[in-house]
Regions:
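Beta-strand elements within well-structured catalytic alpha/beta cores of enzymes
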Residues: 1-3, 42-45, 49-52, 74-79, ...
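Active-site His/acidic residue clusters
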Residues: 1-38, 84, 91-92
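Histidine-centered active-site microenvironments of extracellular/periplasmic hydrolases
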Residues: 10-12, 47, 55-123
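A long, amphipathic alpha-helix that forms part
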Residues: 21-73
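Flexible glycine/proline-enriched surface loops and loop-helix/loop-strand junctions
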Residues: 30-37, 77, 89-95, 114-129, ...
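A structural signal for well-ordered alpha-helical segments within the folded catalytic domains
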Residues: 36, 43-51, 105, 135-142, ...
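C-terminal cap/loop subdomain of S1 sulfatases and analogous C-terminal strand-loop tails that border
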Residues: 83-103, 126-129, 133, 138-237, ...
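Long, internal low-complexity/basic segments
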Residues: 228-232, 237-279
Length: 279
């Protein structure tokens, strides 16, 4: 079974979830009440997750007598975009916020646990494992398909699908894997501003060989609309997560630009895809 619970709506905290109070219940680390509706809503997310995990912990798994559902559930926690507000408190070391092609618009936390499948052990006493592999939420299609042993749809034809989905299951298990092919975050923050030079920008994001480090090349709106390549900005995220130093005009990075442009050219158009046929 698949479930995707979310607490997106309404955009104010509930009075309570079951027997757990929410509105007016959020506290700082000191234990003092925050008296903040926004922080109550953040706390509601914590309550949602805790209640779900508690249910999985106490419910027997009918597929595996003697075990609870938590052991054989692939639990994923993430967000569909960056922080709503442009604030150091919300976005930390990242530039911009929700809707932007900069890292603050789409770089989000991602947590995974599946004890029976070798993804963590589900114990709070055990330190988690970190992974710096490039990942996109559309990768969850291929990841779940591999976890349940199902093939992906074809890349062409009437029933095609998952053309930009790459399984992250091996990386979740801690195995060494080849770098993921490029991803293409886009910008809907500026896309509706018809007078903006930055409307509908797209970025090419890659850690793949022959690149050394985490690189990101920005293309203007002509890529999204006409598949034309007009680079605007280049950042080395390994050293510049804030995206503050544009390296595009530095000749020593011309090969990086060339590689990323080729990635964009390959993926352009209605027939473009990043998943290889063997995936």
């Amino acid at each position: 079974n698949f479930a995707s619970p979310s607490n997106h709506s309404p955009y104010t905290p509930s009075e309570a979830l079951g027997e757990d109070p929410v509105a007016g219940a959020s506290t700082f680390k000191s234990g003092t009440l925050t008296n903040s509706q926004r922080l109550d809503f953040v706390y509601q997310n914590d309550v949602h997750v805790a209640r779900l995990l508690d249910f999985l912990d106490r419910t027997p798994d009918p597929r595996r007598p003697g075990h609870m559902l938590r052991d054989n559930t692939l639990f994923l926690f993430s967000s569909d975009n960056g922080a709503e507000r442009s604030s150091k408190v919300c976005t930390g070391p990242l530039r911009s916020h929700k809707g932007s092609v900069y890292e603050g618009g789409h770089r989000v936390p991602f947590l995974a646990c599946w004890p029976y499948g070798g993804v963590g052990d589900g114990r709070v006493e055990t330190p988690g494992r970190e992974c710096a592999r490039l990942c996109a939420l559309n990768d969850m299609f291929a990841t779940v398909a591999e976890a349940i042993g199902k093939p992906l749809p074809p890349l062409h034809g009437h029933s095609y699908g998952a053309e930009d989905s790459i399984s992250q299951l091996a990386a979740m298990k801690g195995s060494l894997t080849a770098p993921r092919v490029a991803i293409f975050p886009n910008d809907h923050k500026e896309a509706s501003k018809k007078t903006s030079d930055k409307r509908a920008w797209v970025a090419v994001r890659s850690n793949a060989t022959p690149l050394i480090g985490e690189w990101k090349l920005f293309l203007d709106h002509r890529y999204a609309w006409q598949q034309e390549l007009f680079p605007q900005e280049l950042y080395n995220l390994t050293n510049d997560l804030m995206e503050s130093e544009n390296l595009l005009d530095k000749p020593e990075y011309s090969r990086v630009v060339g590689f990323l442009l080729e990635q964009a050219r390959t993926a352009a158009g209605d027939e473009g895809y990043t998943r290889q046929p063997a995936e």
